[in-house]
Curated annotation (Swiss-Prot):
The keyword Methyltransferase does not apply. Keywords: Coiled coil, Phosphoprotein. Residues 1-47, 183-292, 374-393, 398-425, 453-580, 607-634, 656-689 are annotated as: Disordered. It holds the Pfam family DUF4659. Residues 38-47, 183-214, 242-257, 664-674 have a biased composition (Low complexity). Residues 374-391, 453-483, 490-513, 542-580, 617-634, 676-689 have a biased composition (Basic and acidic residues). Residues 362-604 form a coiled coil. The keyword Phosphoprotein applies. It comes from the Eukaryota. Signal peptide: none annotated. This is Coiled-coil domain-containing protein 177. The modification Phosphoserine is found at S310.
């Protein structure tokens, strides 16, 4: 049988060790070590027709009609169309074992777990694994059963080799040969009249001994592809050596009539029987063998050498030679032409035998196909039921996990929102307390300043009353100095206020930037995975707490510094007040010289302070320019590095795209060349592809169902 199995799916192995007439054609190297049978041949039982189909109906002159349904041909690997085929030729022993066990060969093929998952995408892995284990256990049990049945078939063949034929069977075979010899006028008449009226019983053949039984001894059953069973070969050689004294010139041959006497009924019964593949072929006709009676034929193979060297074939060839010599006036026919004629006659006889065997096999396989379809429907219903249960359980689990995850996410979001609100509330309270403290300190300082000024004015008024002119002059000088000091103090206070405002603005800008960055980070993390959001929020919360603690420490430090500055200003003011009182007393005693000296000292101090302020401003501007230049240089360096990296990446991308295009063009050219080569070979061989055969089989099956 020819299995239309692609080379990549061949398993190249049988149910057991190869023996007798197993034949494997063109099995790829990666499948030679397989232990499983080449059971993919069952795909031809209900899926596709065989590739090399023997034109059997032509041999009968159109008298036998082919079956309209798909059928299985067990003996189509002898035709010339099957030679050179890429597909597996399975063993008749393996097929017979499958037929006896009511197992389709495709059921012995191993299937991957991915195939079961792909058949039903909704099934869970647990259900798929259970189905896979059940299928694998059932497959191994069927495989073991078929192997045991095949071993039993081989043992029956060995027993037949050692069992001598009875004299009654030998006499019946000789009588049938003598009766068929006169009626064989041509190759067609010989082949049609060589079948007996009824099959000879095996018990009668075993009962009576006869010297002619050696002529009916079969030759070694050799494989058609050159692979022979060494055990059967050695047994047949020993058998042939033991009977060589009685066999004569044709000791290792069968006649066509003796082969037909082995099991099969007359051709009239086979010709009048129902076509293979029809519904009526499921029942056995009175003269047709069932699947269990196919053992003698499907268990062994008869080569052309057995048929071409039989005495009947030799007599037929001699008669044809005499007729040709008489009609054409030729002197003689070469031995090579005689052998060719004998081979042609033997081939015709074997085709008739194979036709009878095929007719019986078609009926049995059609019955097996119907049973297999019913079993497959039951298995499919059970599989769909298990699949639906697994799908419902899986959907319930998924819904439960989805609800639990949603609740956890909502709870985490509410918890994060509460933490954020609490942190914002703490920050606002801290800012309010700090503002209140700053206002209180400013009011206290202003109140103390007013009290100090009032006290100074009262003291000055009392001293003015006692000191008159000098005091008035001193008061005038003091007021001028006080005005200058007030202006200087106002400038200092304005400077301090501006610095405080700048610091507050910078702090507020930094805080806003942090808040904006925080908001942007939260938005980006919310768009990402929720798991990474929790980790990022934790880190951001820690950073925010660190920032709040740092800002609190800075505010405390600034408050401490302001308080220290206030104390220092107060001490400086008190010190200045004491110095001023001493200076006023010295001025009152010393006069104009001391007053001029004080004026010069004050002017020098103001000038020095102005110079220091100008120098500090110049240094700050210089530092700012240096920082700006450094930042610009860093930006230029980063920009150049980025441009260089982009250029290198573009070059690499272009290089990869060129390589990809060249590889794609090379692959396309190779594919086009392969396609044209295959098309040329297909045109020359005029063979059908596997896909086309599958489509034709599906089309014929659909038309037959309609």
């Amino acid at each position: 049988m020819v299995d239309p199995v692609p080379e990549e799916e061949k398993a190249g192995a049988e149910l057991g060790d190869s023996g007798g007439d197993e034949a494997v054609a063109s099995v790829p190297p990666d499948a030679q070590g397989a232990q499983e049978p080449a059971a993919s041949s069952a795909s031809a039982s209900a899926a596709v027709p065989c590739k090399a189909e023997v034109p059997c109906a032509a041999a009968e002159g159109g008298r036998r009609e082919q079956s309209p349904l798909l059928h299985l041909d067990l003996f189509n690997f002898d035709c010339p169309e099957a030679e050179g085929s890429r597909y597996v030729l399975t063993s008749p022993r393996s097929l017979e074992a499958c037929a006896r066990c009511a197992v389709k060969p495709v059921e012995l093929l191993p299937r991957a777990l991915a195939d079961l998952v792909r058949e039903a995408p909704g099934r869970s892995m647990r259900v798929a694994t259970g189905l896979y284990e059940a299928y694998e256990a059932e497959r191994r049990a069927k495989l073991q059963q078929c192997r045991a049945e095949r071993e039993r078939i081989m043992r029956e063949e060995k027993r037949r080799l050692f069992t001598p034929l009875s004299p009654a069977a030998a006499a019946a075979a000789a009588a049938a040969a003598a009766a068929s010899a006169p009626s064989a006028g041509s190759s067609s008449s010989c082949s049609s009249a060589s079948l007996p009226a009824s099959p000879a019983p095996r018990a009668a053949r075993k009962a009576s001994p006869s010297p002619s039984s050696a002529r009916t001894q079969p030759p070694p059953a050799g494989s058609r592809t050159g692979r022979k069973s060494h055990s059967l070969d050695s047994l047949s050689r020993r058998r042939e050596g033991a009977l060589s004294s009685e066999s004569g010139a044709s000791s290792s041959s069968y006649s066509g009539e003796s082969l037909r006497e082995l099991r099969w009924p007359p051709r009239a019964l086979a010709r009048n029987s129902c076509p293979a593949g029809s519904a009526s072929s499921t029942t056995n006709a009175p003269g047709r063998p069932s699947a269990l009676t196919l053992v003698p034929i499907t268990g062994r193979s008869f080569s052309l050498g057995d048929l071409s060297h039989s005495p009947q074939t030799a007599q037929h060839v001699e008669r044809i030679v005499r007729q040709v010599r008489a009609e054409r006036g030729l002197r003689g026919v070469p031995e090579r032409d005689r052998k060719i004629a004998a081979l042609m006659l033997a081939r015709h006889q074997e085709e008739l035998l194979l036709l009878e065997q095929r007719a019986a096999a078609h009926g049995q396989w059609e019955l097996q196909r119907v049973h297999a379809e019913q079993r497959r429907e039951r298995e499919e219903r059970e599989k769909q039921r298990a699949l639906e249960q697994g799908r419902r359980a899986w959907a319930a689990q998924v819904e439960e996990r989805r609800g639990r995850r949603g609740r956890e996410e909502r709870e985490a979001a509410r918890r994060r929102q509460r933490q954020y609100e609490r942190s914002e509330e703490r920050r606002r309270e801290l800012a309010e307390r700090q503002g209140l403290l700053r206002r209180e300190r400013a009011e206290r300082a202003a109140r103390e300043d007013r009290l100090r000024k009032l006290q100074q004015e009262q003291n000055l008024k009392q001293r003015e009353e006692g000191l008159q002119e000098g005091r008035e002059r001193a008061e005038q000088i003091r007021r001028e100095r006080a005005q200058r000091a007030a202006r200087a103090k106002q400038r200092q206070e304005g400077q301090l206020q501006r610095e405080k405002r700048e610091l507050s603005r910078a702090e507020r800008a930094r805080h806003e930037a942090l808040l904006q960055g925080r908001t942007r980070q939260q938005r980006q993390e919310r768009e990402g995975l929720r798991s990474s959001l929790e980790a990022s929020l934790g880190r951001a919360q820690e950073n925010y707490e660190h920032l709040v603690e740092q800002r609190t420490r800075e505010l405390r430090e600034r408050a401490r510094r302001e308080e220290l500055q206030g104390r220092r200003a107060k001490e400086a003011a008190e010190r200045k007040e004491r110095e001023h009182q001493a200076h006023l007393e010295a001025l009152a005693r010393a006069g104009e010289r001391r007053l001029q000296h004080a004026t010069q000292v004050a002017e020098e101090a103001v000038q020095q302070k102005a110079r220091r302020v100008g120098q500090s401003r110049l240094e700050k501007e210089r530092a700012q320019r240096a920082n700006k230049e450094k930042v610009e240089r860093d930006e230029d360096c980063r920009r150049r590095e980025l441009l260089q990296a982009i250029g290198r990446k573009l070059e690499c991308t272009q290089h990869l795209s060129r390589e990809r295009r060249s590889a794609l063009e090379s692959a396309r050219s190779t594919a086009r060349a392969s396609f044209h080569v295959r098309e040329k070979v297909r045109e020359e061989t005029n063979t059908r592809s596997f896909d086309r055969m599958v489509r034709e089989a599906q089309l014929h099956a659909s038309l037959d169902r309609k």
